[in-house]
């Protein structure tokens, strides 16, 4: 008798043709909601249409259907990203001076946009060098193209076309995986398989592919460019890939092929996989051989990580088991029940991912200037400032988004019956202690950090400089930060074996990298002024966290409104007859959190902009004397509020205010226009709904008088809608004002 092993069960993971493709249905506005599909009676309809069109939770309660919509939407998002990237590369190919910049990146500035003369706009086309007239760009694309080994505009064309093809594929995939072969819920909930594929596939193989490209294409091309070879003389990428002898001329270990790899003699490859530290003195960017080594190491780590989770075989980790095993002496049931949250609530997943991605984006902002990854990035001050500012803003928005979705999870997806005495439940039960302590911390930080400035302003005003907190009077040196800097600067070998220099020049030492007479990077001194402003950072960040965390922890209930969960994520007040219960919804906390996020990030980017202009950026003459843009005035001037207003905001706004009649005049107009947008927001934020409803009714009366009354009845925005429009314009106006101020300044002086 033969005993057969049981036949493996084939899991059916997709459903065929679940939703028919119907253009008629899509053409009907509001098709996803019975109420909205009836069409508009009042102007509120258009607002609700925008508010709910992507709120898949409100379309259906079926988790599988919601998951499919989210999955499909992600492909749409990727398509948009590919179209955007294609546009960037197309501008580089069609309208830019990339090839000229590549031949002389020190004297020629990047430009990829030429303004058409219609009513005299050609004034905006400034001279960027090399006889090219255009708008100076600060996105960093030229630098990243050079680092990837792009040597001609034809290559940019090809990449742009490739990106469009990928965009089409993504759109097709989004349609296919919703209408033709939609995954089942079990597929979305198979977290181990998802982890394995994302870690090994996206991060592991993605990094490996990039490392391979860097080794075979970027390194040799950049090596030749650094040596001053004309880009047109450099062999094309496929020649390096197909002809090993070409590479061996630049990196001798290539002649040995894979023998050192299989004989574990890996140090043979140290001519193109290095641990040098510091910056390449020719380009002022990280050594590309270091970044290749980094991507190879990342690839190895993630390829290993992508084999750690248990799927079809009975080996490997199970996320549920890991979570449930985490019980400490003071944590009750630990993480029991958390796995179920993460597999049934997309909002909970999204909240975690946004919090981590937001933090990571802010870390990226700080690394882009301290370890500039691309050639000639460090001496392009406009791009340095733009990249820092951009990544800080994005990080701030993502972190607020994390709180928003955490609160939506609490309101819509949290089931108190399954969460008993685990960590989430315990946090919710002692939320009063958390919030009241955090509130105390905010008050302490606010009074003490701002108090130090007010003390300085008072002493300065009374003519008593010797009684101020500054490097030349009462010193408050950031000794811990200086210790961290010193440790890194004095012992680079602790970071990596045989490292020649520390990870970043900013740590200290006497190293200075200048490219073409401009400072790329040097050790950044920290003093009393930095100590003061860092405590302002601590204050604003803690207040942001207080508002957002209170919104999450009190999203379902509070002493004031015990049944808050029944009112939903956003509601104006707890009904008539309950005064003093307005603006308490989780949505309102996100609304308020956005303002404090804006405060936090503004002070960070102001600090960065002034500090770099004062202590890092500038020119260096043949004698080695550095002339900083603002002459090192940060340490003395920024210790008073008056100094920030006078020597930063006012002094540095002169370029944007005086830009009319020059190629920077667009920034002057933007500065004015964005101030207007910002001021417009106050109209929504400072007035109540009733005021507008009353006004609208008298306007309707006038229309009726003239027999031109509209069929769709006009109504004032709801309270929540008004606040949403207000905060959107506040942020848009504020960010665009800052953008114009920064760029006009840094392009003029940088």
UniProtKB/Swiss-Prot annotation:
The PsaA/B heterodimer binds the P700 chlorophyll special pair and subsequent electron acceptors. PSI consists of a core antenna complex that captures photons, and an electron transfer chain that converts photonic excitation into a charge separation. The eukaryotic PSI reaction center is composed of at least 11 subunits. It is a multi-pass membrane protein. Keywords: 4Fe-4S, Chlorophyll, Chloroplast, Chromophore, Electron transport, Iron, Iron-sulfur, Magnesium, Membrane, Metal-binding, Oxidoreductase, Photosynthesis, Photosystem I, Plastid, Thylakoid, Transmembrane, Transmembrane helix, Transport. GO terms for molecular function: 4 iron, 4 sulfur cluster binding; chlorophyll binding; electron transfer activity; magnesium ion binding; oxidoreductase activity. Chlorophyll a binds at residues 683, 691. It comes from the Eukaryota. It is found in: Plastid, Chloroplast thylakoid membrane. GO terms for biological process: photosynthesis. InterPro entries: PSI_PsaA, PSI_PsaA/B, PSI_PsaA/B_CS, PSI_PsaA/B_sf. Its EC number is 1.97.1.12. This is Photosystem I P700 chlorophyll a apoprotein A1. It comes from Psilotum nudum. It holds the Pfam family PsaA_PsaB. Its main location: plastid. Belongs to the PsaA/PsaB family.
């Amino acid at each position: 008798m033969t005993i057969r092993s049981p036949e493996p069960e084939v899991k059916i993971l997709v459903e065929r043709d679940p939703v028919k493709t119907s253009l008629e249905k899509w053409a009907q506005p509001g098709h996803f909601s019975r109420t909205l599909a009836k069409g508009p009676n009042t102007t509120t309809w258009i607002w609700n249409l925008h508010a709910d069109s992507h709120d898949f939770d409100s379309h259906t309660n079926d988790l599988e259907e919601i998951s499919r919509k989210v999955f499909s939407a992600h492909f749409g998002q990727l398509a948009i990203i590919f179209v955007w990237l294609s546009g960037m590369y197309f501008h580089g190919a069609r309208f830019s001076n990339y090839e000229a910049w590549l031949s002389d990146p020190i004297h020629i500035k990047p430009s990829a946009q030429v303004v058409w003369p219609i009513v005299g706009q050609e004034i905006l086309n400034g001279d960027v060098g090399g006889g090219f007239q255009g708008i100076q760009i600060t996105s960093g694309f030229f630098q990243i193209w050079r680092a990837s080994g792009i040597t001609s505009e034809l290559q940019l064309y090809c990449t742009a076309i490739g990106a469009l093809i990928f965009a089409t594929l993504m759109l097709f995939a989004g349609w296919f995986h919703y209408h033709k072969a939609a995954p089942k819920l079990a597929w979305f909930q198979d977290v181990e398989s998802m982890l394995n594929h994302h870690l090994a596939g996206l991060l592991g193989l993605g990094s490996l592919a990039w490392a391979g490209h860097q080794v075979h294409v970027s390194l040799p091309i950049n090596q030749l460019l650094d040596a001053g070879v004309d880009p047109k003389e450099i062999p094309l990428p496929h020649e390096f890939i197909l002809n090993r002898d070409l590479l061996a001329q630049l990196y001798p270990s290539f002649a040995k092929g894979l023998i050192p790899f299989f004989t574990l003699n890996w140090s043979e490859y140290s001519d193109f996989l290095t641990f040098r530290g510091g910056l390449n003195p020719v380009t002022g960017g990280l050594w590309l051989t270091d970044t290749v080594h980094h991507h190879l190491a990342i690839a190895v780590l993630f390829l290993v990580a992508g084999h750690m989770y248990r799927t079809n075989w009975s080996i490997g980790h199970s996320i549920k088991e890991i979570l449930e095993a985490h019980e400490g002496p003071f944590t009750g049931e630990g993480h029991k029940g958390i796995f179920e949250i993460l597999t049934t609530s997309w909002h909970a997943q999204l909240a975690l991912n946004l919090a981590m991605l937001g933090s990571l984006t802010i870390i990226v902002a700080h690394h882009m200037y301290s370890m500039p990854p691309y050639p000639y990035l460090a001496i392009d001050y406009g791009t340095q400032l733009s990249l820092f500012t951009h990544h800080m803003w994005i990080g701030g928005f993502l972190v607020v988004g994390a709180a928003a979705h955490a609160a939506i999870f609490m309101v819509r997806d949290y089931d108190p019956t399954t969460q008993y005495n685990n960590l989430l439940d315990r946090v919710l039960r002692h939320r009063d202690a958390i919030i009241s302590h955090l509130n105390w911390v905010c008050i302490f930080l606010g009074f003490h950090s701002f108090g130090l400035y007010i003390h300085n302003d008072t002493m300065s005003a009374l003519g008593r400089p010797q009684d101020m907190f500054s490097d030349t009077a009462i010193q408050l040196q950031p000794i811990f930060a200086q210790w961290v800097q010193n440790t890194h600067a004095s012992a680079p070998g602790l970071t990596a074996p045989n490292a020649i220099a520390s990870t970043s020049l900013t740590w200290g030492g006497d190293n200075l990298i200048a490219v073409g007479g401009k400072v790329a990077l040097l050790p950044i001194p920290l003093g009393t002024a930095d100590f003061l402003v860092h405590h302002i950072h601590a204050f604003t960040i803690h207040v942001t966290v207080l508002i957002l965390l209170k919104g999450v922890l009190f999203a379902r209930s509070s002493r004031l409104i015990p049944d808050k969960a029944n009112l939903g994520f956003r509601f104006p007040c707890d009904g008539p007859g309950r005064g003093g219960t307005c603006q308490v919804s989780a949505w309102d906390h996100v609304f308020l959190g956005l303002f404090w996020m804006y405060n936090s990030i503004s002070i960070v980017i102001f600090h960065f902009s002034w500090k770099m202009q004062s202590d890092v950026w500038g020119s260096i003459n043949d004698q080695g004397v550095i002339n900083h843009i603002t002459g090192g005035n940060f340490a003395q001037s920024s210790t008073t509020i008056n100094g920030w207003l006078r020597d930063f905001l006012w002094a540095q706004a002169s370029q944007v205010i005086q830009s009319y009649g020059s190629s920077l005049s667009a920034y002057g107009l933007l500065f004015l226009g964005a101030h207007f947008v910002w001021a417009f927001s106050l109209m929504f934020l400072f007035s109540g709904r009733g005021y507008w409803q009353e006004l609208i009714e008298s306007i309707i009366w006038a229309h009726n008088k003239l027999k031109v009354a509209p069929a769709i009845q006009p109504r004032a925005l709801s309270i929540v809608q008004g606040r949403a429009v207000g905060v959107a314009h506040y942020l848009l106006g504020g960010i665009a004002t800052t953008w114009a101020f920064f760029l006009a300044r840094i392009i003029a002086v940088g």
